[in-house]
Structures are given as structure tokens and as C-alpha cells.
Amino acid sequence: MAYFVLESEFSNDLLNSIKEHLRDRLPGVMVPTYFVNLESLPLTPNKKIDRTSLPAPESGNIGSNHDFIPPRTITETIITEIFSDAFDNPAVGIKDNFFDMGGDSLLAVRIISRISNALQKEIPLEVFFRFPTIEKFAQFVDSPAFMEDVSESLPSGEDLDTEYLSFQFIDNQETESFPNLDAVALSYIPESFMQVTGLSKAELIKDWFGNKARLTNSYKTEWGTIGLVMLPIAESDLYNDSNSIRSIIMDGLRLSAELGASKVSLTGILPLITQDGLDVINWMRENDEEVNLPIVTTGNATRCATIIKSVEGILARSGSDMSELRVSFIGLGSMGMSTLDLMLDVLPHPRGIIMSDLYQQEDRLKEFQDQLLASGFAGEIDICSCDTKLSDKVYEAELIIAVSNIPNIIDINKVRSGTMIVDYSFPSSFSVIDAARRAEQNGDLIFTSGGQLCLGQPIEEIIYLPRVAEEMLEIINPEKMQSIIIRDSKEMTGCILASIFTEMDSGVGVTLGKFTDAEALSHYEFINGLGLAPSRLQMQSYFVTDEAVEKFRGQSSSGSTSITG
């Protein structure tokens, strides 16, 4: 919050120029969210500014370039109250924009979780990013288009065999009936699971999970049996209460130990909310349980290597030569930069790199640019700092690699014909429905997840359902159930495999906190040494068809660069 005194009359143009002046000179997190115009600054008897007497913003104060408008509907009122609490500001109006107020993706997840609970609707995070003002967001949530938007399904894609898959009905307390595990991947309830079961979040956690972590899957590999232990919490709630997260994760580790696992990997966003696993280690030590529980890894070095294998896969399927491509890299946090560095270590250098990140300031991007040049990269480097959407420059690349946490940051309508996308983002960085439709109909775009590896042989999987699920089979949507459980029988995610791979070799150790380029390279070489290959092109259980790939290869060879949309 900024307080200021003007010698001249206030205007919106003046406010905008003040904001621009600060944005040019300060990191984004330091730019004030609200600006309050005072006749004079309160002073102490010593003539210093009396900070305790500075007023909180009121509806007449200046926080944006629009007039304050209070909520008018029940939905607007609920959302406004949640915004006010999240930003610790009582003067939030329905025209206020989440991003202009200083919000980021982590705060967005917390707000969406609270709004979903308050409205008793499961609201996808991407909707919030599409409608960042309270007014527009409330209008969409209350509209008939909301249910149509969230219920649209993917095209069918390729058919898969299910012979590798079996089901068992078993309750948590029957641990003697579970297999002995060598490793565990710790996960959480996917948001789509509520739609599949027809249960509310609270009902699912109570009736399906019994308010406890439970073993939901086991995978029999040549290196041992991996279990998937799912925590009784939905993704959107992981950012809310750190104390409850601690308790839930520790319970998951204790169950893993009880099932025989000697090592555990953190999947999805669990590394992000635990300071890359360092919090988990501290909790184990504070509880004096470090000796009795499995070793823990984020698996981030394996994830990084898996992304590069996915890049290799899409290049091979498309018949593309990396040295002839421009590559846009979206997301330059620790995972993003490590992936970019590993790409330059093991693959031919592209002819150009476009670097983009919503949270990095231009000065920081220039530092990354200097690092690449110092490492020997000789191609063109463009940097694109942006606020709430990507620069058009990003779409000039033939290959887009996204390692982000901002949903739908990539506008599929802006993606050029002949573009490939590798996405390792939570949630996904683009609309998979729109991309799949375009791949099938036009054949001018192909894409894949950056998280899958092909093991070359079928992996036997057992899904463990609670006995209460037997009574629910009539209401479970079979098509949606299939969409979240079906995989290629020879493929598995890198974050799950990281559990069993950890300490299998001297070069594949635990990754906690920030990992080094040398660790990423070592994990990449280990994966190659096992003969693991890139997976099929896929996202969210949709598999890009061979026909779509052949269309793409035909269009790419013709050199088409027209913009679709």
C-alpha cells in the first residue's frame, strides 16, 4: 500500500503514470497494490511519519483506475469477502482485478478453494485466470455456460488395452491384504475425481478415504513394486493450512513405512508446497521419526530428465531437427531453468530461444540470457517479460516447452500452424480440449505431456477401491473414470518412477531443495542407461492419433507458418 500527498489535482492518468514509474524500478512484488491520497501525512512529535496513524483504505480512497463499486449479488458478496480477507483489505470492489491487486498463482489457488467451498461448486482454476475481476468471475460462475464449460470432454483419441489393469475392493485397515511395497509415490485427490464419483469433496474424503491416506494403486515393475498412496486432500486445498498438510503428509509416510516402502517420492505439486521437500525432512526430524520412515525425494531431477525425453519424443515423431527450430520456454523457476540447461547439455542447440515468465522481472530474465551466452549458446535469445498473458513473440517458436503453474497461459488460438508443445505444468498450460480438437481436425499442431516415460514392457497395475465403492458403482461415470485411470500399459510418469529409481545407482540420489545441473544430467544418463524411451504423445489420458501426427508431418514439411485462429 502506498500513501501520497499531491500538490496538484488527482487524475486517473496521474495514478497510472505513478504505477508505471514504480513498475519500471521495482520488482513486481514490491509495487503497491493500493494507493491512498492524503491531504497530509500524519507525523509523530519528532516530525517523523506516524505509520500507526496511516488510515486503512476506504471506498473513497484510490486503489485503481476505476470507481469503487460494492457487490450487488450474493455471489459477488461471497467472492468480495474472500478477496478482502485474502488481501487484508476491506475496500475491495467488484471491478478490482486479482492481478492488479498483486495476486499470484498460489494465492489464486487458495482463493479458488475457498470460493468453491462457499458456493459448493468445483470451480477450475483456469476459470479464475480467464475472469480475474470479481464482477466477471461471478457472472460466469452464475451463468449456464459455466456447467457447459467445465463438463466438456476430450475427443476419444487412441484406444488402449486394459489387460494390465485389475481392481480389488479393500479397506485401509486390511493392510495385510496389500502387497509388500518397495517404494511409494505420495499423491493427493485429483479435482476430476469428484466428478467421477458424484460425491462432494467432504463426502469423498470421509466415505472413500475415511479421513486417512490410503493405498490406491500398485505397479509391478522389473525393479520392484511401487505403491501410490493418496492423501485425503484435494489439490486446491493443499495451499491452505500448513499444519493440516504436515499431519496429512506424515500420515502418508507412516502408511508407506507400514507397507514396507523404503523410499517415497513427492508427486505433483507436493514439492512446491513443501519447499522442495525440505519441510518434510524437518517434520520428520522434529517428530524424531527420520530413522523409522522412508527416505524422501522430490524426484525433481528425474522429472527434469523426463521432460527432455518427452522433447526427444515429439521431435522424433514429427521428424523435426532441433537445430532448425526456435524454442519458446515458458516458466523459468528452478525446474524450468534446470530443464533448459539440461536441454542445452544433451540436445543439439536450437537456432533461437524465447524466454518468458510471468513472475520474473526483465532484469532477472536478462541474467538468464547472460548465463546462456556464457555457457556457449550461440543462437538468438529473446526475453519476454509479461503480466497476465504471454507476449505474441512466444508464439513465433516452432517448439513451446512450458514448465509453469498458470493454467491456460498458452492461447491455442494463437499457436501457429506447425507448432509442437511439451507441457509439464500443474495445471496444464493450455486447453487440452482445444488442442486435441485442432490436432484431430487440422493436423497442424501436436503436443504431449512432459511427464511420461516408456518402459518397453507392460506394467501390471492393481487399483484398490474401498468397499463403500461397491455400492457406488451405479452412480460412477464410467467414461470419466476411464479418463483418469487409463494409461498405456508400458508407460508411467517420471515422478512415480523417481520413487523406485532413488539410490538405485550412485548417480541417482535423493533430490531435496534446489538440485544441480550435474544431478539432472546424472538422472538423464541413468534413464537412458535403463533403455527407457519417450512415451506416446498424450495429455490427460488423451493420446494423439497416428493420423494426426501424419497430418502434422505433412503440413510441417510444406513449411506452413500461417496463424490459425
Feature map (PLM): residue ranges:
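Active-site nucleophile and cofactor-binding loops and adjacent substrate-binding regions
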Residues: I295-R303, K490-M492
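N-terminal ligand-binding/catalytic initiation module
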Residues: E152-E289, A498, G507, T511, ...
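Phosphopantetheine-attachment site and its flanking helix in carrier
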Residues: T77-E81, D96-Q120, P132-K136
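AMP-dependent adenylate-forming
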Residues: M1-R72, E76, T80, D85, ...
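Glycine-rich phosphate/diphosphate-binding loop of Rossmann-like nucleotide-binding domains
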Residues: A316-L399
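Hydrophobic/small residue at the entry helix of a nucleotide-binding pocket
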Residues: R303, I307, M335-S338
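Adenosine-phosphate binding glycine-rich loop
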Residues: V196-I205, P427, V432-G565
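Rossmann-like adenosine-cofactor binding region
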Residues: A378-E460, R467
